[in-house]
Amino acid sequence: MKKKIGLICEGGGTKAAYTCGVLQCFLDENINFPYTVGISAGAEVLVAFVSKQRERLKVAGVDAASNPKAIGLYPLLKERGVFGIQYVCKFIEELAPLDYQTFMENETELDIGLYNMDNDEVEYYGKEYLDPQEQILVQASCALFLLTRPYKWNGHTYMDAGLVDMIPIEQSIRKGMDKHIFISTKEENYVRKPAPSWQLRLSSLFYPGKKNVFAMRIIIANGEL
């Protein structure tokens, strides 16, 4: 019996360049998967993988990540956040427009993880939810904690699912995959250090009145953020 193998990509910001290199090799060798799932930058690059666009992987993982307008004062003025996810998505589209037809016709399934701030749950949406023009689904998945503003979409407030589910292997299991290939953006033997207390204070300041603040307290206290 043929095993069903899921491909899992975590976030990692600019370190997703390494993920892009692996995905390019998969494309070069015609290695396909029935199911893929990603969060944050992992979701962004999986869009390029499912659309079979080698150049888009390079643009997303290297060119966009190294663009000086992606981080700092420019996005702070334009998007009210230190990381300019809207600018990055537009930059990628200008240099390597999404081949939406190939993306949708590819039999590979793609789930993108978002953190719903209203109910403290991670929700996964298939590629059919991706608007090829706005791409709010990807932008919301890449909305980094404390660095970008949350996104309103589908009647709820969303941000980077890495707050809760850094490695979405459980979603791959739920989708019936027998085995899983995980592309990590962390070095071998990586152990996350406890987060500093200032993140707890900033979370209360940045996200006042949200039901998820208590959940964030637990996440930060456990050093999982």
Where do the model's predicted regions map?
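Patatin-like phospholipase
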Residues: 1-39, 47-225
